Amino acid sequence: MAPPLPVSLRRREEMKLPLTTSRLLLRRFRTEDLPSFSHYRNLPEVARFQSWTHYSMTEATAFYEQQRSLGFAEDESWFQLAVEIQANGALAGDVGIHFLDHGRQAELGMTFSPAYQHQGYAREAMRAVMALLFEQLAHHRLTAVVDTRNTGAIKLLEGLGFRREAHYRQNIFFKGEWGDEYLYALLRSEYQ
């Protein structure tokens, strides 16, 4: 069993989570999420631009145990939010927040099941996370790193107001080949 969270981190989480939108609930993962989580992360079209190729239930369970022990907004940690459809309780995907620079910056990432892509759920979830980070937690800068071939994520980030800051050429050896990535960023002063 994971050790209890420090009081300050537990209180911070209680004040901020879950996040709700008109259609979504963004919350900590639960054990009942793991079969759906493992299933969509194991799909080739989902894993294509991610660091994994296969995502087993064993890996999903290890992920869950690691996430249970994390405090919300713990510096230098990736905190994953489950994205639940309020209407039916289905797990649509997840949004990751990499808290950096003692709460001044964060890197964002997202993974969604193909069944819930192209319906505005990722945009809605990202807007909720951006509002949390900029408006409630007063972050200065948000970033996202994306494979240059991931046109869906690029379109989403640009639609949310992120601007491309860098093109890293062959900066990552990824699934047997050198790959390019874009760095996107958004400052609080640019946030709408």
Task: Give residue spans per PLM region.
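Conserved GNAT-fold acetyl-CoA-binding loop/helix
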Residues: 45-68, 81
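Acyl-donor (CoA/ACP) binding surface of acyl/acetyltransferases
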Residues: 2-48, 80-192
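Hydrophobic residues in alpha-helical segments
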Residues: 41, 50, 71-73
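Short loop/turn motifs at secondary-structure junctions and domain boundaries
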Residues: 71-76, 162
